[in-house]
UniProtKB/Swiss-Prot annotation:
InterPro entries per the UniProt record, alphabetical: 6hp_glycosidase-like_sf, EDEM1/2/3, Glyco_hydro_47, Seven-hairpin_glycosidases
Keywords: Endoplasmic reticulum, Glycoprotein, Signal, Unfolded protein response
Gene for this chain: mnl1
Residues linked to a glycan: 479, 609, 670, 693, 756
Subcellular location: Endoplasmic reticulum lumen
SUPFAM superfamilies the UniProt entry points to: Seven-hairpin glycosidases
GO annotations of cellular component type: cytosol; endoplasmic reticulum; endoplasmic reticulum lumen; endoplasmic reticulum quality control compartment; membrane
Protein name as catalogued: ER degradation-enhancing alpha-mannosidase-like protein 1
Organism placement in taxonomy: Eukaryota, Fungi, Dikarya, Ascomycota, Taphrinomycotina
GO molecular function: calcium ion binding; carbohydrate binding
Length: 787
């Protein structure tokens, strides 16, 4: 097959017709160098202070200027102990960042310190996932750079000590995989192993996102047990997906049952998707590509917002929305979409996170989609948004992403800098800082920002194919990692770049992103105006365009989804729903329209010219007037003498009983029935009266002795939800008899000239409403049900 560059990556020569009105503030080569060096300076401010105040502890406390290690006094403090294993966390995590910065002397010195100071014989219980991605990944990446001459960082007299340490750590982690399912325990004590009666809950991401590191260890040592354990865990999680292809968030490692059956792309599940696609790149195994493709298909259908600016959390069994927020971890997803060639989706999603970033100055841990406010406060120096910005720039070379990176650097330096490091934000609204600088800030956030502004970095050279792990560690993609794969499909590198980008041909002062017609609309979704957007990121002549549909709502009758093949069937432009139970219905509203539109039915997407028919005979059990209901109120009136017909609207008739089949004689009344008539009414007569100023219910009550009431209207609004209990009364629970009542438009007043009339319910398809709002493309097929 062709290379990954041609199959998946959008490695672009931009097909742009630049206009004068596309100008966004320019970043020239000198400014690029300046921003690159700013990234370098910020890194060393954090790194040097860690080495001065915190080494050999795991983390630097940036406010108190001291080192931080495990919380030995409180072993249950998993927020700390999951990552701090008393194993030089920050130093190991940043080793290959020194390579990216071109610091050969610093890299050699750091490797020497790791070799002489690290010790895994520690009585600390760490998270298997964190130890793998931060420590194991850091050791493996650094071993490769230290041992291979071609990368320019080979260390004289280096004897593979980092690989030995990596192997020792992996051996200490392997007992966690000894479960009936092959899914590892979340935590393990480095000295004592898995604790007796250890918690059996693990999240999908932590259980499955170990493939890259363990496969690299197998490639370097030749011992297949590492790769086999990680692969078994990955596919053990995958095979427990729901019937609609969605994973849950947390799982019981002993039984394999989902504990928290909620799906999304954020915390608890994020890196599963990342490692599905990256494992395909790294190993060339088509099984991982299949997992990615099926996952993305289900995510787009069940979790994506209508216009795919963000992905929501839904119940994995039925796709119903569970929460109304997105978290900062999910900001990695645009970058992953870039790698998979879904560039347009990546741009849209990145714009949404960028708008949130502008609103608060950083990405909050959780952002509420509907209140447009912070749901979970804080910013712990996470790298995901910087990572996606980097990938999008490498794929598009659009100056917009350089400006985004410039903003990130500026906010870091101006708001997060402390005399001895950089501090996480505890409260974004008050911008109070917390005394913590997690290792990923140096190993990922500043690494991606440095690479964003360093086009000429050796990492970007075409003959060096690297893949970033979920912790930002660099693994070279070589034949060695794919030797055990029977079918090699992958032939190219992971980082998607426009390799022959010619600055003289494509000046950097142009941006296609700032000129997008949905640029302002995304800001509107988040609730910010142009005043919050830097002027150099605004196209003054840009065109604003609103999407055709706004996000709507979903309905699901029953607790789980049924197979869409059994209950939803398409015949050309008609879609038939034979069973409403188990089919999620998504309704949206067109911009500027007073009606709703059924957008999806089960797994079927509804097109503009489609008509949807419900053929479920039990529909009345699940519909009601104050929610989804079908207006079976078309009345067919007929002159039995001439055969002339016309149609009106039933305001009242008993669905449980057949309409009277007899012929009524007609009587025309000059006055409305808002007042009780003085004469006795006849049950064999149809009374025709003008619609009065009182409610139709009151008029029908006043005509309760009649056989039929026909109200003539000039087009006044009649509330279809008004019913016989609408009048305030102590006796509203008693249902009085009122005759069948029909509303007839004035142009059909010729009925009053008929001597007799018969009436029945029409066989026309019944239109649908949701809480009184019409649904333009959904009908109840009465003929289908009656037959």
């Amino acid at each position: 097959m062709g290379s990954l560059h041609s199959i998946f990556c959008v490695c672009l020569i931009l097909l742009c017709i630049f206009k004068e009105n596309s100008i966004v503030g320019a970043i020239n080569s000198a400014r690029m160098v300046e921003l690159r060096e700013t990234s370098r300076r910020l890194f060393y401010h954090g790194y040097n202070n860690y080495m001065q105040f915190a080494f050999p502890n795991d983390e630097l406390a940036p406010l108190s200027c001291e080192g931080l290690g495990p919380d030995y006094e409180n072993p249950n403090n998993i927020g700390v102990n999951d990552v701090r294993g008393d194993y030089l966390l920050t130093l190991v995590d940043v080793l290959d960042t020194l390579v990216v910065l071109g610091d050969r002397e610093g890299f050699q010195d750091a490797v020497d310190k790791v070799i002489h100071h690290i010790n895994f014989e520690r009585d600390t219980k760490v998270q298997v996932f964190e130890a793998t991605i931060r420590i194991l990944g850091g050791l493996l990446s650094s071993h490769i750079f230290a041992s291979e001459e071609k990368y320019g960082f080979q260390i004289p007299l280096y004897k593979g000590e980092l690989l030995t340490l990596a192997t020792e750590l992996a051996e200490r982690l392997l007992p966690a995989f000894r479960t009936p399912t092959g899914i590892p325990f979340a935590r393990i004590n480095l000295m004592k192993g898995v604790a007796y009666r250890e918690v059996t809950e693990n999240c999908a991401a932590a259980a499955s996102s170990l493939v890259l590191e363990f496969s690299m260890l197998t490639a370097l040592t030749g011992n297949n047990k590492f790769k086999a354990s990680a692969e078994n865990a990955f596919f053990s999680v995958w095979k427990r997906r729901s019937g609609i292809g969605l994973l849950g968030n947390s799982i019981d490692v002993l039984s394999g049952r989902w504990i928290y059956p909620v799906s999304g792309v954020g915390a608890g599940i994020d890196s599963f998707y990342e490692y599905a696609f990256k494992s395909y790149i790294f190993l060339g195994d088509p099984r991982y590509l299949e997992v990615w493709q099926k996952s993305l298909e289900s995510l787009r259908h069940y979790t994506a917002s209508l216009n795919e600016y963000y992905y929501q959390n839904v119940y994995s069994a039925n796709g119903m929305v569970m929460s109304r927020w997105v978290d900062s971890l999910s900001a990695y997803f645009p970058g992953l979409l870039v790698l998979a060639g879904e560039l347009e989706l990546a741009k849209k999603m990145h714009l949404y996170y960028f708008s949130i970033y502008l609103k608060f100055g950083q990405l909050p841990e959780r952002y509420n989609l509907y209140t447009k406010s912070i749901e979970l406060n804080g910013y712990p120096l996470r790298p995901e948004f910087a990572e996606s910005t980097y990938y999008l720039y490498r794929a598009t070379k659009d100056v917009f992403y350089l400006h985004v990176g410039e903003l990130l650097l500026s906010n870091i330096e101006n708001h997060l800098w402390t005399p001895c490091g950089f501090a996480a934000v505890e409260n974004l609204e008050k911008y109070t800082l917390s005394n913590r600088m997690e290792s990923f800030f140096l190993s990922e956030t500043l690494k991606y920002l440095f690479l964003l502004f360093d086009d000429d970095n050796p990492i970007h050279r075409s003959h060096h194919d690297f893949i970033f792990t979920t912790e930002g560690h660099l693994f070279p993609v070589t034949n060695q990692t794919r030797l055990s794969t029977s079918q090699r499909i992958y032939d190219g590198g992971e980082v998607c770049v426009a390799e022959d980008y010619d600055r003289s041909k494509w000046p950097m002062l142009y941006s296609l992103i700032a000129s997008r017609d949905d640029y302002d609309y995304v800001s509107h979704l988040v609730g910010i105006d142009n005043k919050a957007i830097p002027s150099y990121l605004i196209d003054p002549s840009g065109v604003c365009k609103r999407p055709e549909y706004s996000d709507g709502f979903e309905l699901l009758y029953g607790s789980a989804l049924v197979s869409p093949i059994k209950s939803v069937e398409r015949v050309t432009n008609n879609v038939y729903i034979s069973d409403i139970i188990g089919n999620k219905l998504k309704f949206v509203q067109k911009e500027g329209s007073n009606s709703l539109f059924l957008y999806t039915a089960g797994a079927e997407s509804i097109n503009e010219n489609d008509t949807v028919f419900l053929t479920d005979p039990d529909y009345e059990t699940f519909t009601r007037p104050d929610a989804l209901y079908f207006d079976r109120t078309i009345a067919q009136l007929e002159n039995p003498n001439s055969g002339q017909k016309t149609f009106g609207k039933f305001l009242q008739f008993d669905n449980d009983n057949s309409l009277p089949s007899k012929v009524f004689k007609t009587v025309l009344l000059n006055n409305s029935m808002c007042q009780k008539p003085s004469d006795t009414l006849d049950k064999d007569t149809a009374y025709i009266a003008p619609l009065g100023n009182c409610s139709w219910v009151q008029q029908a009550k006043n005509t309760n002795k009649a056989g039929l009431l026909i109200l003539i209207t000039d087009g006044e609004f009649i509330n279809p939800l008004e019913n016989i209990h609408s009048q305030n009364s102590l006796f509203n629970w008693v249902k009085p008899y009122i005759p069948p009542t029909i509303l007839l438009k004035n142009e059909n007043n010729f009925v009053s000239k008929w001597a007799n009339v018969s009436v029945r319910q029409s066989d026309f398809d019944a239109p649908s409403y949701f809480q009184g709002t019409p649904v333009s493309n959904l009908y109840l097929c009465l003929k289908c049900i009656n037959s």
